[in-house]
Regions:
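Conserved phosphate-binding loops in nucleotide/dinucleotide-binding enzymes
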Residues: 20, 25-32
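Cofactor-cradling patches in redox/metallo enzymes
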Residues: 220-329
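C-terminal substrate/ligand-recognition segments
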Residues: 130-131, 135, 141-151
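Intrinsic disorder at enzyme termini
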Residues: 9-10, 30-126, 151-206
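Generic beta-strand/beta-sheet core signal
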Residues: 41, 48-50, 60, 78-84, ...
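Single conserved hydrophobic/aromatic residue that forms the stacking wall/gate
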Residues: 1-8, 13
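Flexible loop/turn segments at secondary-structure boundaries
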Residues: 20-21, 45-46, 55-56, 85-87, ...
Length: 331
């Protein structure tokens, strides 16, 4: 047996076959429950429209994170047998500004060399197809791409008629707190949250932002769920916001904190931009924190740019919340 129950003594070799069969049977029954739930809604297409599959995934992710944060579920190197000092990891440093300028140049060259008349004709055909519902839209989109119409132009040709989809942001509550139960860090975070609310006359308000082309939002949703269960008022920004859009939403919602979730290495470009946008709007008092996959080599630069706190992988939600609340209470 290793450590505190990482390898239990309940199962021996002769029982392992039954144990695996039992787990397999459990998975099959739970999967069937999900299938029946979807069927009752009229199939997967209907279920997706209601947002049920996405919500179930987010609930499972929140439970999992809560068990990890509380130590109930142990992961070697994360919350059990952690190294006293992490070895530095060499990473490929990419100059985002240079990449952006290079891509803009390529696009300019592409547009200068393409047949604009052919592009306009192809895009007009797409708009007409969407309007009349006559013809093969996919075929027309492929033809437009062949004459070098961009994906944005093709989608704009459709948007003229049908508009653009706007995601409905739904959140869950109570899932994270039901799993962490009496975790000391979680309880401490709730106490600080109550202290802030008493001092300011309202709950601390945080906006979780996904900026640029970072489409990974499950971690951000889990963090939002955890903060809400601690006592924060939480606003969730849509995917692919620009720093300007996120700053505007933060000001309109009068938040105390903007939490930038970064999983696509855009933090050195996007975090300074949102801080600058908040300054333009006269709201330098809104603090900006950063969470996600942030190399330690980038921490100093982010702090110089104005980030108030940085939370890397493996940071328990309650630990991050305590740090945020301590910053807010110190102001």
């Amino acid at each position: 047996e290793i450590g505190s129950g990482l390898v239990g003594s309940e199962m021996c070799i002769r029982d392992s076959s039954y144990y695996v069969e039992s787990l397999t049977n459990e998975i099959a029954h739970k999967a069937w429950e999900r299938i029946q739930e979807v069927e009752k809604l009229g199939g997967m297409a209907k279920a997706i429209e209601t947002g049920i599959p996405k919500m179930r995934i987010e609930e499972a992710a929140a439970r999992k994170q809560a068990r990890i944060d509380s130590g109930e579920e142990k992961i070697i190197g994360i919350n059990e047998y952690r190294l006293e000092k992490e070895a530095p990891i060499d990473i490929l440093a990419v100059d985002n500004t240079a990449v952006r300028e290079s891509q803009i140049k390529r696009l300019q060259e592409l547009r200068a060399s393409r047949d604009e008349a052919a592009v306009k004709k192809a895009l007009a055909a797409i708009t007409e197809c969407v309007k009349t519902k006559q013809g093969n839209l996919l075929e027309l989109a492929v033809k437009a791409a062949k004459v070098r119409a961009s994906l944005g132009e093709i989608s704009d040709a459709c948007e003229v008629v049908v508009g653009r989809y706007k995601a409905v942001i739904r959140s869950i509550s109570g899932v994270y707190s039901s799993e962490v139960k009496n975790d000391k860090q979680f309880e401490r975070a709730k106490e600080l949250c109550a202290e802030f609310a008493k001092k300011e006359g309202r709950q601390p308000r945080v906006m979780i932002a996904k900026l640029g082309q970072d489409g990974h939002d499950r971690g951000a949703k889990v963090v939002a769920t955890g903060y809400a269960d601690i006592g924060f008022d939480v606003d969730m920004g849509p995917l692919f916001q620009t720093p300007e859009e996120a700053a505007k939403q933060a000001v309109e919602n009068d938040v105390h904190v903007v939490g930038v979730s970064s999983l696509a290495a855009g933090h050195l470009t996007l975090v300074p931009q949102i801080i600058a946008e908040l300054k333009k709007l006269g709201r330098e008092d809104i603090i900006v924190i950063v969470g996600g996959v942030i190399p330690h080599q980038d921490y100093d630069e982010l702090y110089r740019d104005g980030a108030a706190a940085i939370f890397g992988p493996g940071t328990p939600i309650a630990t991050a919340a305590i740090k945020i609340l301590e910053i807010l209470l110190a102001e």
